[in-house]
Amino acid sequence: MQYQSTRDKNLKASSAQAILNGLAPDGGLYTMPSFDEVKFDYTTVLNMDTMSMSTKILSKLLPDFSEAEMAKLVHDGYTGKFETDHLTPTVPVGEDFILELFRGPTSAFKDVALSMLPRLMTASKEKLGVDDEIMILTATSGDTGKAAMEGFCDVPGTKIIVFYPHGGVSAVQQAQMATQAGENVCACAVRGNFDDAQTGVKKIFSAVSKDQLLEGKGVRLSSANSINIGRLAPQVVYYYRAYADLVQAGRIQPGDKVDYVVPTGNFGDILAGYFAKEMGLPVGKLVCASNANNVLTDFLRTGRYDRRRPFHKTVSPSMDILVSSNLERLLYLLSGDDKLIADLMKQLSENGEYEVPADMLEKLHELFWAGFCDDEGAKTAIGKVWKDDHYLCDTHTAVAWDVAQQYKQANPEHNAVVVLSTASPYKFPAAVLEGIGEKAEGDEFDVMEQLHKVTGVPVPKNLADLRSRAVRHRDVIDRGEMLDYVLGKAAAEK
């Protein structure tokens, strides 16, 4: 199976090439032409452990790697890094279920993919005979940055630069990045919001490709964002894991559909659910939960994408996004029309908006349901879930929980509902503490201790240790300086 660019299907790449390149030369995203070659009988994985399940699914999506090769990569990527061998447990909360994706080394769902991506990238280099150093460029709205830095820390032949919005991530998230060890890692704040950082990274890829700025320097660029298919593919697995958990617990029968509610910013996590559905998993509705930056809610309801709106800094900062990159993959897979996608993305870049054809909107309505929740709603949800079920959730999960209740009220005939929980509550302790009716006092680390004393919920060790770590990364730049910053780092390596 060859991957192809969403904007020009003649630009093809093997799965290993797509992983190494990150982004297609024309700025499009590498995507499979259809799901025909990756479909399989989901019942064959229901009784597998998570490692075996990951091996099976990833070797389907990334066919350059045999099952034996993938099994080793999975073992090396995950062993000893998560709180449980299960990696992503599913727990009942009230009448619904929460899929806990935050049990990894940085307490965020990105760990599932970013524990694997460095192994996939290194193996792709070997498979393709590439000797160049791989410089990873990543924009983060909070969680990807630390997870990527942790994953690539001191991996030979790689260097990673993470750009994050200055003042646009939580204090805990910033501390996680600023204190990251490793000789090959770098975090830099960008004056602006996440969309500025993400657009800047895309422009760097385009400029380097067009003007051959790294030609002959022994360095090539790639990405650890979910625009990289190697980042997206591992996220498909936990949809199967949750389904298998519900079957094994006797909560559903094989063949029953499950509705998944996903806190959504860049559209990667929920797109992985769409991949799982098209590969054959009995997925009912995919519910897209947004915060006050509800551009996706409006789009999935009306078919009109319009980023020309106020940008809100919220208590769920990883979702503070107005340009959702992975949506491009979905639109391509629904239409198969690369010229249409290229035109829509051009309209978005030049005019700030686009509208999809009526037949595509109809398909979107069949697949997705969308809702949003503001900060007050999220804090209320945190308090209610804690009071009713003694379960402590973070702000992003709270957004999804609130939208899940909206969805159930609007759709009384819904299936079993699984809410994806994307981060530990201790990454956003002040808002969580306020949600359970307590006043936050002191800095974020004081508040973390306060939250623990009030709830008794253990603080993940990687977060508890943050306060004592030395700050190593302090750079702050304007968005127009990003290219020069990267070229300077590349030159410094030689």
Per-region residue spans from a language model:
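PLP-dependent amino-acid enzyme catalytic core
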Residues: M1-K494
